Amino acid sequence: MAIYRFVVRFNRSDNPRALGLLKDAHALGFAELKLIQCQDLYFIEGDLSPEECMRLALNLLTDPVTQSAEWDELPGGRIDLVADVSMVEVALRPGVTDPVADEIVRAAHELGMAGIVRASSGFRYIIQGAVVETAVELARRLLANMVIQRWTIGEIEPSFPG
């Protein structure tokens, strides 16, 4: 069965979540960071048509006024970043309850998308001004809660609740 990765971005880089994380990173001593982009990740397993992916993105996963979404079927294409930009993805550890994912499945079924089997959620952080070592330290100290979340540099593999 197919697994889709939906990436939801804010249309503006000055959204409160990104600005708050950048401020926190600077307070922790990561003064070299220029920008942190916060994006929501949703992994959806099921049989979806392109039209259903569009409906899911527009009607359920985004606020179309402030956000936009893109999606692909896993494995997706490779993401190329420039030299001073790193990407960290964070997701819940296997076995941790994901109420956002539960609601996605429930709401998608209400919208008539019965082909959705399960979902999981996470976050993507694009960090400008960070070499990989800095991104690793930032993930450990700020971006992930190690008790309930796992993280990786680059794209994370989805895990779904049992």
Please tell me what each predicted stretch does:
Residues 1-162:
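Core nucleic-acid recognition elements
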